[in-house]
Regions:
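C-terminal ends and interior cores of transmembrane alpha-helices
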Residues: 31-57
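Multi-pass alpha-helical transporter architecture, strongest
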Residues: 43, 131-167
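Helix-to-loop junctions at the C-terminal end of transmembrane segments
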Residues: 8-22, 121
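Residue-level signature of mid-helix packing/kink "hotspots" within the transmembrane helices
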Residues: 3-11, 110-111
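Loop-to-transmembrane helix entry/capping segments in MFS-fold secondary transporters
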Residues: 92-102
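Hydrophobic core of transmembrane alpha-helices in multi-pass small-molecule transporters
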Residues: 51-77
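Intracellular juxtamembrane helix-capping segments at the cytosolic ends
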Residues: 77-90
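A membrane-interface helix-boundary motif in multi-pass transporters
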Residues: 54-59, 119-137
Length: 167
């Protein structure tokens, strides 16, 4: 199910990126991740609230499935929009190099993220570790504030023109 919603997230946010731009769309994917993690964290209170307010008889597992669907949308959208941003900012002549760095740092982030979550789970329990993930996604929003998307694309184009001219 997560793979299907990840595909859906990649397609939907790809279309959204064409309208809103890469930076804003990437910020939205990070906010979607935060919402998904909050949904996971608050599954039991959300289940109780939905049951009480709407007269439903949901089980926590059903609400958790919804949180999993949000996670899938988040996964597919953030990966596709992130790669598209790298592609926009990478001069064609250096695209392989920059995508190589992208891949390396993605793998390092996964390693340190798992280590951090594992350490925090050991120290504070699973729920504390889940909240750590929210912190990581919130921190990822900060560098986006300084990115000038038009300037990045223009710089990549100038670098390509310089490479073609032999500069």
């Amino acid at each position: 199910v997560v793979q299907i919603t990840a595909l859906l997230g990649a397609v939907l946010f790809g279309a959204l990126q064409g309208r809103l731009g890469g930076r804003l769309t990437y910020a939205l994917t990070l906010l979607l991740w935060i919402a998904a993690i909050l949904a996971i964290y608050f599954v039991e209170p959300m289940t109780a609230s939905l049951n009480a307010r709407l007269g439903l008889a949901l089980h926590a597992e059903q609400v958790f499935l919804f949180a999993g669907l949000l996670s899938g949308l988040s996964l597919g959208s953030s990966q596709s929009v992130g790669r598209a941003l790298v592609g926009m900012f990478a001069p064609e002549s250096r695209a392989a190099e920059l995508f190589g760095f992208w891949g390396l740092f993605s793998k390092l982030a996964a390693i340190f993220g798992i280590f951090g979550v594992g350490l925090l789970q050991w120290l504070f329990g699973l729920q504390g570790a889940v909240l750590f993930c929210i912190l990581l996604f919130a921190l990822a929003l900060l560098p986006l504030l300084a990115i000038d998307e038009a300037r990045g694309v223009a710089t990549a184009r100038r670098a390509d023109e310089g490479a073609r001219a032999g500069v």
